[in-house]
């Protein structure tokens, strides 16, 4: 088994492996895979579809080359472009249904500001709620003065919270206080409680975070 990942090694990581390529400073696993392909030279030709899939992964994890984007990220993208990756085709991979677009807009409209955080929620549920919530959380970061965004929604009787930031607020810490986890800029948790209780617990977690971390 081969493990290629841009996350830090976990205590209970995947074992045994014949090779582990872990680089937390990389933007994405797709960047690492691309680097390996490039390393092996001309003998490692890839199809256009494979190149587009790898470029899509890089664009997804970096939010279109905004988050965790380094020189090596652009070098990987340039290599994939040389291999025939079509950026228009990649863009189409992220197209939403009209229902998802409407739900994302509804979530954004429900948002309010709380201590430099944008918080949105919905009690409605539909098949692509996770996609809509994730995209809404990303877009809420575009509001002036917002350091983090949180979107609360329900699936199968469980309350979910998707959290995002640009780095000024460590949403991993906020979500860990609610039993979840993730990264500095992307995290999540699940709660077995009502929507109102989840909103209160999130507010308390935000309060606790800012009490322990001075606001700049």
For the regions a language model picked out, list residue spans one by one.
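Hydrophobic aliphatic residue packing
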Residues: 2-3, 33, 146
């Amino acid at each position: 088994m081969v493990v290629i990942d841009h996350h830090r090694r976990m205590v209970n990581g995947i074992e045994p492996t014949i090779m582990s390529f872990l680089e937390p400073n990389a933007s994405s696993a797709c960047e690492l895979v691309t680097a390996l392909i490039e390393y092996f030279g001309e003998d490692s030709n890839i199809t256009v579809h494979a190149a587009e899939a790898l470029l899509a992964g890089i664009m997804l994890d970096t939010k279109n080359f905004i988050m965790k984007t380094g020189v090596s990220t652009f070098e990987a993208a340039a290599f994939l472009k040389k291999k025939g990756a079509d950026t228009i085709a990649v863009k189409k991979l992220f197209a939403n249904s009209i229902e998802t677009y409407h739900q994302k807009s509804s979530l954004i409209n429900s948002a309010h500001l709380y201590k430099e955080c944008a918080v949105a929620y919905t009690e409605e549920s539909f098949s692509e709620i996770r996609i809509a919530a994730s995209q809404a959380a990303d877009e809420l970061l575009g509001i002036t003065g917002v350091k983090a965004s949180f979107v609360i929604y329900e699936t199968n009787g469980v309350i979910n919270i998707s959290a995002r930031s640009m780095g000024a607020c460590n949403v991993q810490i906020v979500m860990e206080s609610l039993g979840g986890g993730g990264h500095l800029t992307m995290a999540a948790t699940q709660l077995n409680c009502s929507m109102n209780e989840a909103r209160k617990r999130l507010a308390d977690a935000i309060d606790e975070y800012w009490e322990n971390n001075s606001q700049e």
